[in-house]
């Protein structure tokens, strides 16, 4: 579905609603890993929609999908170097769920790179996003930044993750608690980065 424009260029994503759904449903912005909007993310979007959400899986790579780590790294680095278009993209996704789908509540969820952007979306729209879920996304214990968060935060991390070390997660959690935020941070012992990806080698069902 085409859900907005970034720099005058249309952006498309994957929209899923529960079968036989009626009325207004809570919305969920789903943000892909560093691979891009691939079949695994579409499957996750469908699974989440079956729980009663209208789900919009965004595409931050303008249609590009990587299958090898070096290619994924290039796409992720380009996104980090120029985050403005991604921010505009995610604002458009929120606006679609809010204005077109009339979702009464809207949350964000993402894995890996998408986990970082799930948190970033919550920081972009702190008075609008109603909940944010971070699966092993890069986080920082910056009080000045995290103070803006106004919604419940769920963080799911892995003890063996070298991308997002346990010490970083501990500092992040401590900062959220010090700020009095509604945060639920889980550290899965023995798990590694990517543990929630059924198509990956680190999957822990």
Report the location of each language-model feature.
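Short alpha-helix in the alpha/beta-hydrolase fold that links the catalytic acid
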Residues: 44, 165-175, 184
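C-terminal catalytic histidine-bearing segment of alpha/beta-hydrolase fold enzymes
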Residues: 177-205
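Alpha/beta-hydrolase-fold catalytic nucleophile elbow
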Residues: 59, 109-111, 133-136, 156, ...
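Acidic catalytic loop of the alpha/beta-hydrolase fold
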Residues: 160-164, 193
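Primarily recognizes the serine-hydrolase "nucleophile elbow" in alpha/beta-hydrolase
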Residues: 90-150
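Short beta-strand/loop motif that positions the catalytic acidic residue
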Residues: 149, 155-157, 161
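Serine-hydrolase catalytic machinery in alpha/beta-hydrolase-like enzymes
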Residues: 1-100, 194-200
